[in-house]
């Protein structure tokens, strides 16, 4: 599939706003889109879906096997998409400790031309050195256009264009400074798309700005250039948690990877959804229950009072149904959760741990996992960890994973398992072996 990547020299350059505006503008033009987010981020894909009307897949070149990334891109083509629009993560060449797994690696793997969004608010002629350096840093990554962001005036724009002219890298557009084109944030990144009351208006405004200030025909020329890679349709996927998987999905449990659901369905699993915040129970015939991450610390009181949900999960665990929680889901499986105000809320009590959001500490990075039992996965896994909550009390129980960081440093054992119930703070992305 043809497409392009929106990347930047650093986080905070405006690439998410540009990506959303372009997705909505291209949708209005009738393009059938395949939105992609590089890396493990859960929040941006929901915005991509809102802008494009299509589910967004995470493609993570550190945590995913290259053949899985290729297969997922092939799946998007099968669904009828014509233009893949990828948003990079952090700076273009930023990855794990060794630099691997960057947006540049994904662009190379999928042979995507890169459009570089540069924050010009505090520079003029120096932009030439920056763009030249990025364009020369890796010859296998092609920067085929630049979008100037946060331009102060027509004079400022003329200076920037003049500085870049000798480089031969096309300037696709210049976006004026506009505080209205910013998205609200909180501790794990942007506020979730479903909680952004004015999102539709924002997306339309962003699309209008892109149409007015970006040469859309020149952008189309970039993504229509010949492709050189062959996508693979069939590749081994992670085993599903069960044959009939009930997945918690609402504002408290919003962090789940689309590629996992797609892979589980390909392996024959049925997936249903339920909302703990609405006090819904999982389907009675589910043989596995998945509580993904999200923001349980923001909804702890409602979860504590969701009697139907709590009873159903407890009964399922007593019957031996697989119950698996990741990050926020892991916290909900514990005994209590302390919110930011220091109030303790009773959780499901299926795992012997107590967690706190009042005593915050950042835990962030890619993880290599060796499963220790309790899940259908017996091969090494790749995962991501990102949370501020801390474990304040933990009783003895079997561990779920042996953990190393991206550099291979031993981080000890993590997660808990009691009977058919298990969980950890790790977000599993893919396996790193030969067999599933």
From Swiss-Prot:
The keyword Ligase applies. PANTHER family: COBYRINATE A,C-DIAMIDE SYNTHASE. The a and c carboxylates of hydrogenobyrinate are activated for nucleophilic attack via formation of a phosphorylated intermediate by ATP. CobB catalyzes first the amidation of the c-carboxylate, and then that of the a-carboxylate. InterPro entries: CbiA/CobB_synth (IPR004484), Class_I_gatase-like (IPR029062), CobQ/CobB/MinD/ParA_Nub-bd_dom (IPR002586), GATase_3 (IPR011698), P-loop_NTPase (IPR027417). The active site is at residue 327. The gene is cobB. The record marks 427 as: Increases nucleophilicity of active site Cys. Its EC number is 6.3.5.9. It is an enzyme of class 6 (ligase). It comes from the Bacteria. This is Hydrogenobyrinate a,c-diamide synthase. PROSITE patterns: GATASE_COBBQ (PS51274). It catalyses: hydrogenobyrinate + 2 L-glutamine + 2 ATP + 2 H2O = hydrogenobyrinate a,c-diamide + 2 L-glutamate + 2 ADP + 2 phosphate + 2 H(+). Keywords: ATP-binding, Cobalamin biosynthesis, Glutamine amidotransferase, Ligase, Magnesium, Nucleotide-binding.
């Amino acid at each position: 599939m043809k497409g392009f990547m929106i990347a930047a020299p650093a986080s905070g350059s405006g690439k998410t706003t540009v990506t959303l505006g372009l997705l909505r503008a291209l949708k209005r033009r009738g393009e059938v889109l395949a939105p992609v987010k590089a890396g493990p981020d859960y929040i941006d894909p929901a915005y991509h879906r809102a802008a494009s009307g299509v589910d967004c897949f995470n493609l993570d070149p550190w945590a995913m096997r290259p053949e899985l990334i290729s297969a997922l891109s092939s799946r998007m083509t099968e669904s009828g998409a014509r233009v893949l629009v990828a948003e990079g993560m952090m700076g273009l060449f930023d990855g794990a400790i060794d630099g691997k797994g960057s947006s540049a690696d994904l662009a190379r793997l999928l042979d995507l031309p890169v459009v570089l969004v540069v924050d010009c608010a505090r520079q003029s002629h120096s932009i030439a050195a920056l763009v030249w350096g990025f364009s020369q840093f890796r010859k296998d990554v092609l920067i085929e256009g630049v979008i100037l962001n946060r331009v102060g005036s027509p004079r400022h724009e003329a200076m920037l264009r003049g500085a870049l002219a000798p480089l031969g890298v096309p300037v696709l557009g210049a976006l004026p400074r506009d505080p209205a084109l910013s998205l609200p944030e909180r501790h794990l990144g942007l506020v979730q798309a479903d909680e952004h009351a004015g999102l539709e208006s924002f997306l339309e405004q962003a699309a209008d700005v892109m149409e007015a200030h970006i040469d859309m025909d020149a952008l189309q020329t970039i993504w229509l250039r010949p492709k050189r890679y062959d996508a693979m349709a069939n590749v081994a996927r992670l085993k599903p948690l069960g044959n009939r998987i009930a997945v918690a999905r609402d504002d408290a449990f919003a962090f789940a990877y689309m590629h996992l659901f797609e892979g589980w369905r390909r392996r024959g699993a049925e997936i249903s959804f339920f909302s703990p915040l609405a006090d819904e129970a999982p389907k009675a015939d589910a043989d596995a229950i998945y509580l993904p991450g999200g923001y349980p610390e923001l909804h702890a009181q409602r979860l504590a009072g969701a009697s139907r949900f709590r009873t159903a999960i407890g009964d399922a665990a007593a019957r031996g149904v697989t119950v698996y929680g990741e990050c926020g889901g892991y916290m909900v499986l514990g005994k209590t959760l302390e919110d930011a105000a220091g109030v303790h809320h009773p959780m499901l009590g299926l795992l012997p741990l107590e967690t706190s959001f009042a005593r915050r500490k950042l835990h962030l990075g890619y993880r290599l996992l060796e499963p220790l039992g309790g899940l259908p996965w017996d091969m090494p896994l790749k995962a991501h960890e990102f949370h501020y909550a801390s474990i304040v009390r933990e009783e003895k129980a079997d561990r779920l994973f042996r953990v190393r960081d991206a550099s291979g440093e031993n981080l000890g054992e993590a997660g808990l398992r009691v009977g058919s119930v298990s969980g950890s703070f790790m977000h599993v992305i893919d396996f790193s072996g030969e067999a599933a």
